[in-house]
């Protein structure tokens, strides 16, 4: 396609659509309109304005542009300067935008690059934005809401999980979503995030019943177990490589309030936590109602503390202080500051727990995530803590500096996913796993340290992986939603899984628009 002229591009689009057998109906008039907008324009943003209308495209001098750029979770994405931002309000708007930008890329070679922003939570630079290109900000996309029988809920990709929970909690229902409020549905579902309920039900992506997707041709299609099932499967973990998800339909399940909260401890108690964590994470069988994160935090003026997240998701009735967590509850608790509680344990709903967890996150800052996995091992948890502490000491005086180490168990019952249909493929971990969600944040004034911190984190993780391999406890797995830009989740999937994903990409995006024109996120390997 890159060698074709515009008239050839336009004339070939119906053929392209027909290549995607059974995907949807192609409407030539829509492409004629997009072509007319491109032909009469001087730039990609000009063409987009003609296609969508001037009220749906904003520029650097507009307040709505500043609001969009300032609302990313990580200020690293605010470093970029898109030429314009499109604010679609329907799947049809997204369709027009994609058709226009696909055609525009051939009139203005090397231009019309675009990013797609749902919730805007992925922290690395360029994940959902682009410099001198276009951002499609899905913030204004509508949500259909809960079904009459409460069995499903359909929401836009920019809807945050706590708003989903709020609707479902009112009906004693829930779904798989992130543990932290404020994160968008789109990225967490296409990246297969983890939930309080993951030991029972698997990954967030495995709860998706239907995707509404805009393909590179501009066609709006449904992908589910019956329609375009290969696309449905690919999007369950395939991230942004196949199209733009404009609506997500999630299955729900019965779930009432449950027991949980946070407990706070002195860093000196960490060895006790590590031993309890190893026992919990190694359990066979694993208690599927047990959710636990051991969190070590450097913050608050320069000291470490521990803030654990404990939930036991059994409800009707809820079970307070269940047997599985009694060893954890014996460890002495210490308020972070005098006058603060030593724990927040109570019976509550998932909306409340997710918002409590989010309240511990400072906005806005520059953030970096990363992930490492190993077999449950208390000694290695201490080793990694010491390595992390040593690696980051040179940065602890940066304004707003915070380091968070989240040790999370991933039992085989979660990793195996009960035969779920998704694009994670077989996860060969030789048993239960502990993975670390690494998060570093600091103030905007310290942006000059971005590259140095990234290099230090890479060196740390390479050394830690080497040590884990030496000890025989390395596990070839990372949680996709916790990966940094240098940790492609696709490097951890089987060859057959990658081949299947690439074949699906070429089927639904034969001109590879989402591989070449959308640089953000994690791209599929070239095979």
UniProtKB/Swiss-Prot annotation:
Keywords: FAD, Flavoprotein, Oxidoreductase
Domain FAD-binding PCMH-type, first and last residues per copy: 78-255
Pathway this chain belongs to: Mycotoxin biosynthesis
InterPro entries assigned: FAD-bd_PCMH, FAD-bd_PCMH-like_sf, FAD-bd_PCMH_sub2, FAD-linked_Oxidoreductase, Oxid_FAD_bind_N
Keyword NAD: no
Family to which this protein belongs: Belongs to the oxygen-dependent FAD-linked oxidoreductase family.
Record's protein name: FAD-dependent monooxygenase CTB5
Source species taxonomy: Eukaryota, Fungi, Dikarya, Ascomycota, Pezizomycotina
